[in-house]
Amino acid sequence: MVQTHSEVKRVEELRRLLQQASYAYYVLDAPVMEDAVYDQLYRELQQLEIQHPELVTPDSPTQRIGERPATQFLSVRHNIPLYSLENAFNVEELQAWDQRWRRQVAPTEAEYVAELKIDGSAIALTYENGILVRGATRGDGVTGEDITQNVRTIRSIPLRLSFDGIENIGKVEVRGEAFLPLEVFKQINEERQKAGEQLFANPRNAAAGTLRQLDSKIVARRRLDFFAYTLHISGMDDASIANTQWEALELLQKMGFRVNSQHQLCQSLAEVADYYRYWDTERLNLPYMTDGVVLKLNSFKLQEQLGFTQRFPRWAVALKYPAEEAPTRVENIAVNVGRTGALTPLAQMRPVQLAGTTVSRATLHNSDRIAQLDIRIGDTVIVRKAGEIIPEVVRVLKELRPVDTQPFIMPTHCPVCGQPVVRETGEAVTRCVNASCAAILKGSIEHWVSRDALDIKGVGEKLVHQLVDKELVHSVADLYSLTNEQLFVLERMGEKSAQKLIEAIAQSKNQPWSRVLYGLGIRHVGSVNAQLLSEKYRAVAELSSAKQSDIAGIYGIGAEIAQSVYQWFRISANQRLIERLQAAGLQFANTEEISAVDNANLKLVGKTFVITGTLPTLKRDEAKALIQKAGGKITESVSKKTDYLVVGEDAGSKLEKAQTLGIKQLSEAELLKILA
């Protein structure tokens, strides 16, 4: 059917009216339209779009629900990483954070924005030309899952932004928290109970689970809500938009987002402390759950100067409330054995509700902690969730102790393999040192196949336990000689599954030297340290023959890690493991750097680069990869040792510092010319 001009105009008018009504109802909580009128206009719009499908747009109110259920969520890379926040658990730790950031910059006065920390699930929204084009889960902060179909069902998230008073808007990135109001959470659990379904433990878990539903109609019925708290706009001068977090929150509201109304601008830490104490009790009267206060430096200029650590922004902190505590009874003390052989005592307790979750186990850390607590089987203890995450026993109520209890003694032999355990001088941890211990082997294989190591898909804890228990593998090297016939004896392992697993294992042979090094599980060597070591020692032969003092001299390594690495390579069993893995085809050298191309042909060897701002065509990771492939080194901060600063749009304090130090600046075009 051919559309008329009047029909096009009517569709636009209906969308405008419905969007205004939704904003007033869901965001402002101030309805401007009767439900019957809204329904009538909605049906009229729906009918016009059915008659003229070409008029349907992604921001239409009719597009919030009803799409075909997804079969899976696609992994997407965030345009701007979603960092975690550093935690503080009291005012003293807050003051320590304040002192740390002040040491990074010249003495300055600062304002703080205090916001309630909503206990939900973080999501990232992307708008292009004012239209919502993507919603994604936080994931690991770098990559998340595309949940756009589900995000559209959240009524407090605008499908089209309002840009009154703002011109030439670019791509808009908004971060916020999706959550379930307590009343809605209660209703959902009542419905699940009637249906005989498992109840959600808390609103946070329910919100996270809802966002990952494949059917958006289910998401719509769950009635998630959303508070926006972070705004990024590309393609514009930041100063023309907002100079502060406070201004950004105001702008988010103008754009059509719901912003938590309880935020406060504070001129001092004393005001922050008052805000924190006030909401410690008042938060219990809110219609949603909170688990602390997020504190941010108000000035964006100051935020840019401070930057980020590897995990946190230096300019923000999460001030958590004291963890919830409850009494319960210790029914047993078990001892777990980890991949490094560490014996960890674990209190098995009568289940108790803490912070909305059921807790039945708590770590006791080591024998020193047990002695300090004097904890015994049968004791009544106070358990809390430290940081709302890790349950721990904080004290024993000895006045309630049964008369027949006995002090707990750490085993002298490994509870898994039966071999004697040792406790090295100066260490609090007791360890099994039997390299053939099944617990150590299982842990080492689980570590080897993990995402940050060799990232072998389809190898989980249950499969690892089967492989070890059936004696199919005695080290990670045995994974590379598994056959289909061997795998057929495992539970739920058919011909296709076995072949798929063998292919995944074979594919891991292409993982780089840094991942292999991390996968070896050397004590104290995390993924970042493995990267540093692999950059310095480009092949295993170089690292294994390096002096301990040379290893310790690498920036970010230090004496403890160096000693651990040096000693690991002195053990003959580890030397044999490397030989077997090399024979299997694993990468024990940086093949891109040590190849037929020698250093003479690597144009950027010995040069240090810093990148700032948004480059015209290259993503930052792409620029880094090109520089590193040519032998250059990337660092995050500008110093006298920096050779080049690659400058894009919206460059900040790094450019100023480079100009002060006389460091040469390159545009993207100039960088590509050098690389050509």
Swiss-Prot record:
Keywords: DNA damage, DNA repair, DNA replication, Ligase, Magnesium, Manganese, Metal-binding, NAD, Zinc. Its cofactor is Mg(2+); Mn(2+). It comes from the Bacteria. Residues 599-676 form the BRCT domain. Its EC number is 6.5.1.2. NAD(+) binds at D35, A36, V37, Y38, D39, S84, L85, E115, R138, E177, K296, K320. The active site is at K117. GO terms for molecular function: DNA binding; DNA ligase (NAD+) activity; metal ion binding. Zn(2+) binds at C414, C417, C432, C437. It holds the Pfam family DNA_ligase_ZBD. The keyword Ribonucleoprotein does not apply. It catalyses: NAD(+) + (deoxyribonucleotide)n-3'-hydroxyl + 5'-phospho-(deoxyribonucleotide)m = (deoxyribonucleotide)n+m + AMP + beta-nicotinamide D-nucleotide. GO terms for biological process: DNA repair; DNA replication. Transmembrane segments: none annotated. Belongs to the NAD-dependent DNA ligase family. LigA subfamily. DNA ligase that catalyzes the formation of phosphodiester linkages between 5'-phosphoryl and 3'-hydroxyl groups in double-stranded DNA using NAD as a coenzyme and as the energy source for the reaction. It is essential for DNA replication and repair of damaged DNA. This is DNA ligase. The gene is ligA.
